[in-house]
Amino acid sequence: MPRRREVPKREVLPDPKFGNVDVAKFMNMLMLSGKKSVAERIVYGAFEQIQTKGGKDPLEVFTVALNNVKPVVEVKSRRVGGANYQVPVEVRPSRRMALAMRWLREAAKKRSEKSMALRLAGELSEAAEGRGGAMKKRDEVHRMAEANRAFSHFRF
């Protein structure tokens, strides 16, 4: 591990339309090759779709979806006496958010709708209702942690 001082976390400015930091972080995660305007168009397009199709507040749907997808526990490999054990550990809050956003992005990419905005809208709506690819991923991680609960005494 490096022995230098800890690098400070960078402040993320809230997004221009909703004034929400989480939306801005999600846009930054979605962005490819520094094209923020494209990422903005995708996210705001998805929010528009949620508004028109569901008639719900898109920001609320986004927040509920994120909270539903956030993992509580995950497994980490730990070597003990020549054997590797999958040890369940609690996920710290910043990593929870990052994983939830990453899983939402990946699940949206795998969907079959025409545009990324439509895919993202579908995934966010489904995640808010407790189903979809991102929720499946979260449940899979929780299942792994539950299956390896016997090794929880090998805490890090």
UniProtKB/Swiss-Prot annotation:
<comment type="function">
    <text>One of the primary rRNA binding proteins, it binds directly to 16S rRNA where it nucleates assembly of the head domain of the 30S subunit. Is located at the subunit interface close to the decoding center, probably blocks exit of the E-site tRNA.</text>
</comment>
<keyword id="KW-0687">Ribonucleoprotein</keyword>
<comment type="subunit">
    <text>Part of the 30S ribosomal subunit. Contacts proteins S9 and S11.</text>
</comment>
<protein>
    <recommendedName>
        <fullName>Small ribosomal subunit protein uS7</fullName>
    </recommendedName>
</protein>
<dbReference type="InterPro" id="IPR036823">
    <property type="entry name" value="Ribosomal_uS7_dom_sf"/>
</dbReference>
<dbReference type="GO" id="GO:0006412">
    <property type="term" value="P:translation"/>
</dbReference>
<dbReference type="InterPro" id="IPR005717">
    <property type="entry name" value="Ribosomal_uS7_bac/org-type"/>
</dbReference>
<comment type="similarity">
    <text>Belongs to the universal ribosomal protein uS7 family.</text>
</comment>
<dbReference type="GO" id="GO:0019843">
    <property type="term" value="F:rRNA binding"/>
</dbReference>
<dbReference type="GO" id="GO:0003735">
    <property type="term" value="F:structural constituent of ribosome"/>
</dbReference>
<dbReference type="InterPro" id="IPR023798">
    <property type="entry name" value="Ribosomal_uS7_dom"/>
</dbReference>
<dbReference type="GO" id="GO:0015935">
    <property type="term" value="C:small ribosomal subunit"/>
</dbReference>
<dbReference type="GO" id="GO:0000049">
    <property type="term" value="F:tRNA binding"/>
</dbReference>
<keyword id="KW-0694">RNA-binding</keyword>
<keyword id="KW-0689">Ribosomal protein</keyword>
<keyword id="KW-0820">tRNA-binding</keyword>
<dbReference type="InterPro" id="IPR000235">
    <property type="entry name" value="Ribosomal_uS7"/>
</dbReference>
<dbReference type="InterPro" id="IPR020606">
    <property type="entry name" value="Ribosomal_uS7_CS"/>
</dbReference>
<keyword id="KW-0699">rRNA-binding</keyword>
<dbReference type="Pfam" id="PF00177">
    <property type="entry name" value="Ribosomal_S7"/>
</dbReference>
